[in-house]
């Protein structure tokens, strides 16, 4: 065999190992803790449980934050019983990492299991067909990791290929899809379980008059887990709901220190610059233009490129209402474009990496309920956007699936 023949043979083998079509979302499952906190009464609970009722002016500020948050309720593992038993969690700056870790290493994979079981049930295939696991959390760090723990909890095969992502932050719902997309498309027959599980036990802390950015986080964050089954070339018995056609990641210019999280003896501290909404809205147009150019124009599919940003569906991480408001204004979006995102923010708060997967699930369900033509609010193309530390933006170009109305 000549060198050219050997090279051609190797190329053929590599091609045979790859899938034919794009990565596809085959099922979605979500889960939340049992404890529900109404946003309207949360300031009273928060300042009472942290013994901070004497901070009357700060409580008024916090109440206004909660009123303007666009949130109706949130779910959290932490409750009065846990917090009273662990008062170090209620101080702003007290050594508490061991307590937080002890909670997170148990509850993060447990909540991930609940979401995964729902996704596997919807998928309808035996869990033995799961070939890969991608797990993401910003809540705690451990070895072996939450991926190992979830593998044990679900009874997955010990040979499942695992990837654990810790400390990524709010953009990571896009990151896990980007990574899982590459895995699914480059491994023929792969079925990837993607899990994001977030618990606020690592960030909960009492109020501080000198760190209002931390107070913003206390007004926004909630607990939740989402799981997705991803694979290319769906079988007849599988029911795809979205295709992943392109993905990218960007560090926005002049954004150093805009969103930071630091793991300390006191837990995970959260720092937020006031101009985060402005930085994101200023750059989002270029991010989308670059994505569309790469996905459509440079790949020979210019005729498929949507005419405008109002001709696509939007799944945007709800970092807070100000981000959504300024992106809407900058991109001149119709009010309904962020409806799915705002619905999830209202019902669950900011669940960090899990949010965009909750929104994806909500969108396909509402599209079917409203008898629209596709899983993407009746439209063919859409974007999923994750915003987080860096300041990083993750972008995934989605194609919806036709619904049998």
Curated annotation (Swiss-Prot):
Encoding gene, per UniProt annotation: CHS
Taxon lineage: Eukaryota, Viridiplantae, Streptophyta, Embryophyta, Tracheophyta
GO biological process: flavonoid biosynthetic process; polyketide biosynthetic process
Keywords: Acyltransferase, Flavonoid biosynthesis, Transferase
Catalytic function, reaction form: (E)-4-coumaroyl-CoA + 3 malonyl-CoA + 3 H(+) = 2',4,4',6'-tetrahydroxychalcone + 3 CO2 + 4 CoA
Organism: Equisetum arvense (Field horsetail)
Name used for this protein in its record: Chalcone synthase
Pathway: Secondary metabolite biosynthesis; flavonoid biosynthesis
GO molecular function: naringenin-chalcone synthase activity
Entry EC no(s): 2.3.1.74
Catalytic machinery residues: 170
CDD domains in alphabetical order: CHS_like
PANTHER family associated with the record: CHALCONE SYNTHASE, HYDROXYMETHYLGLUTARYL-COA SYNTHASE
InterPro entries the record matches: Chalcone/stilbene_synt_C, Chalcone/stilbene_synt_N, Chalcone/stilbene_synthase_AS, Polyketide_synthase_type-III, Thiolase-like
Domain of life from the UniProt record: Eukaryota
Stated role: The primary product of this enzyme is 4,2',4',6'-tetrahydroxychalcone (also termed naringenin-chalcone or chalcone) which can under specific conditions spontaneously isomerize into naringenin.
Annotated family: Belongs to the thiolase-like superfamily. Chalcone/stilbene synthases family.
UniProt-listed Gene3D superfamilies: 3.40.47.10
């Amino acid at each position: 065999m000549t060198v050219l023949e050997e090279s051609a043979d190797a190329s053929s083998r590599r091609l045979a190992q790859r899938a034919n079509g794009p990565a596809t979302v085959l099922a979605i499952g979500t889960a939340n803790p049992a404890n529900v906190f109404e946003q309207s009464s949360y300031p009273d609970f928060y300042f009472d449980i942290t013994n901070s009722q004497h901070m009357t002016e700060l409580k008024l500020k916090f109440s206004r934050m909660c009123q303007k948050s666009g949130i109706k309720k949130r779910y959290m593992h932490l409750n009065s019983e846990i917090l009273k038993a662990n008062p170090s969690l209620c101080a702003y700056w007290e050594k508490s990492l061991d307590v937080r870790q002890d909670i997170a290493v148990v509850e993060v994979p447990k909540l991930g299991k609940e979401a995964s079981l729902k996704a596997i049930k919807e998928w309808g295939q035996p869990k033995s067909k799961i070939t890969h696991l991608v797990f993401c959390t910003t809540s705690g760090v451990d070895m072996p990791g939450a991926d190992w723990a979830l593998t044990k909890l679900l009874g997955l095969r010990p040979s499942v290929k695992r990837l654990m992502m810790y400390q990524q932050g709010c953009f990571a719902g896009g990151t896990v899809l980007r990574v899982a997309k590459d895995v699914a498309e480059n491994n023929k027959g792969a079925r990837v379980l993607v899990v994001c599980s977030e618990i606020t036990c690592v960030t909960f802390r009492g109020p501080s008059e000198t760190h209002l950015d931390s107070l913003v986080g206390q007004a926004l964050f909630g607990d939740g887990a989402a799981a997705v089954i991803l694979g290319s070339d769906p079988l007849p018995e599988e029911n795809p709901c979205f295709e992943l056609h392109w993905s990218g990641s960007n560090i926005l210019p002049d954004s150093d220190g805009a969103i930071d999280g630091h793991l300390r003896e006191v837990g995970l501290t959260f720092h937020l610059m006031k101009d985060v909404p402005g930085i994101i809205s200023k750059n989002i147009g270029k991010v989308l233009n670059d994505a569309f150019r790469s996905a459509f124009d440079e790949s020979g599919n210019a005729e498929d490129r949507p005419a405008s940003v109002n001709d696509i569906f939007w799944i945007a991480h709800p970092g807070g209402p100000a981000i959504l408001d300024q992106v809407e204004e900058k991109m001149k979006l119709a009010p309904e474009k962020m409806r799915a995102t705002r619905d999830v923010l209202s019902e669950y708060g900011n669940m960090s990496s899990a949010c965009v997967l909750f929104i994806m699930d909500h969108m396909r369900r509402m599209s079917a309920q409203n008898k629209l033509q596709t899983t993407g609010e009746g439209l063919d193309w859409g974007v999923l956007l994750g915003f987080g530390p860096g300041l990083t933006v993750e972008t995934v170009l989605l194609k919806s699936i036709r619904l049998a109305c």
